[in-house]
Amino acid sequence: MQRSLDSLAGMATSAFGAGTSAAMRQATSPKTILEYIINFFTCGGIRRRNETQYQELIETMAETLKSTMPDRGAPLPENIILDDMDGCRVEFNLPGENNEAGQVIVRVSKGDHSETREIPLVSFEKICRALLFRCEFSLPQDSVILTAQGGMNLKGAVLTGANLTAENLCDADLSGANLEGAVLFMADCEGANFKGANLSGTSLGDSNFKNACLEDSIMCGATLDHANLTGANLQHASLLGCSMIECNCSGANMDHTNLSGATLIRADMSGATLQGATIMAAIMEDAVLTRANLRKASFISTNLDGADLAEANLNNTCFKDCTLTHLRTEDATMSTSTQTLFNEFYSENI
């Protein structure tokens, strides 16, 4: 019995003190020689049993929080009690009148026996908010609550049309998620992973995607006006018809992206890489592409009036039927064919 209490206390500490994949694996792995032997001969039976209990602990916590809090932004209760967890009582005592330790005290009890642990308040609150987020948007609870960086684990989540205005999604994992038509206006997505996500028609204006991963994402028709995409990874992303007015993409990796039909008026793409990018019928008036790497990029029927390509790499860059008036190309590196094209254009417009 004592070992059972210790095991459950360890699970509670891992789930609500860390919430990561590594913490889940550590908490659900066999602990004794006997458990390792049984686990081996049952082809992982001990681990499966522990994983089931771990998941039940998370789901019970989520339901308890949902039933005791008016919304996920409300203060957490000072005492959270989970009854009948495998015959045990699990209690979380937050700092307050009855707890001056500054940490969340976890107490697992059964009859006259108990086990106590402590977990950081900041981690506990972040994990509880993540559970409530899933409840609010009807997402099934996952045994991995947070990423290794401390963001929410929302991998593959279906959040179509969700209102995520000003949401904190820093370091979150939204890879493969479906956010079609969602509103992320002013959302903080710094360092988040949106690889392969569907962001078609999303409202991302004034949002922060600094150093975020948007590789292979589908962002057709999305609004990114005034968004911060500095240092973001947008390789192979589809940005067809996006509105990116005054968007900051400086230093972003946009290799092989498709920006056809996009509006990039006054967008800052300085130092960005757009090698092999496809840009057809886009509006890029007054766009800043200084020091950008545009090698083998293809500009077709695109308006580059007033764009700044100073010091850009234009080797083997294709410009076909483009508007090049007032274009700046000082110290740009370009192939002979590109230089000839610019010379012919300027001579025709003198």
Curated annotation (Swiss-Prot):
Compartments in which it is found: Secreted; Host membrane
Primary localisation category: secreted
Residue ranges of domain Pentapeptide repeat in the record: 162-201, 202-241, 247-286, 287-326
One GO term describing the cellular component: membrane
Gene this protein is translated from: pipB2
Keywords: Host membrane, Membrane, Repeat, Secreted, Virulence
UniProt xrefs under Gene3D superfamilies: E3 ubiquitin-protein ligase SopA, Secreted effector protein pipB2
Family annotation (InterPro entries): 5peptide_repeat, Pentapeptide-BTB/POZ_domain, PipB2_N
Subunit field text: Interacts with the host kinesin light chain (KLC), a subunit of the kinesin-1 motor complex.
Organism per entry: Salmonella choleraesuis (strain SC-B67)
Its biological purpose: Effector proteins function to alter host cell physiology and promote bacterial survival in host tissues. Involved in the reorganization of late endosome/lysosome (LE/Lys) compartments in mammalian cells. Necessary and sufficient to link kinesin-1 onto the Salmonella-containing vacuole (SCV) membrane. Required for centrifugal extension of lysosomal glycoprotein-rich membrane tubules, known as Salmonella-induced filaments (Sifs), away from the SCV and toward the cell periphery. Required for virulence, but not for intracellular survival and replication in phagocytic cells.
Name this polypeptide is given: Secreted effector protein PipB2
Record text about domains: Contains various tandem pentapeptide repeats in the C-terminal region. The pentapeptide motif is required to efficiently recruit kinesin-1. No position is completely conserved in these repeats, whose consensus sequence is A-[DN]-[FLM]-X-X. The C-terminal 38 amino acid residues, specifically, the C-terminal motif LFNEF, are required for peripheral localization of PipB2 and redistribution of lysosomal-associated membrane protein (LAMP). The N-terminal 225 amino acid residues are sufficient for type III translocation and association with Sifs and SCVs, but not accumulation in peripheral vesicles.
Source taxon at top rank: Bacteria
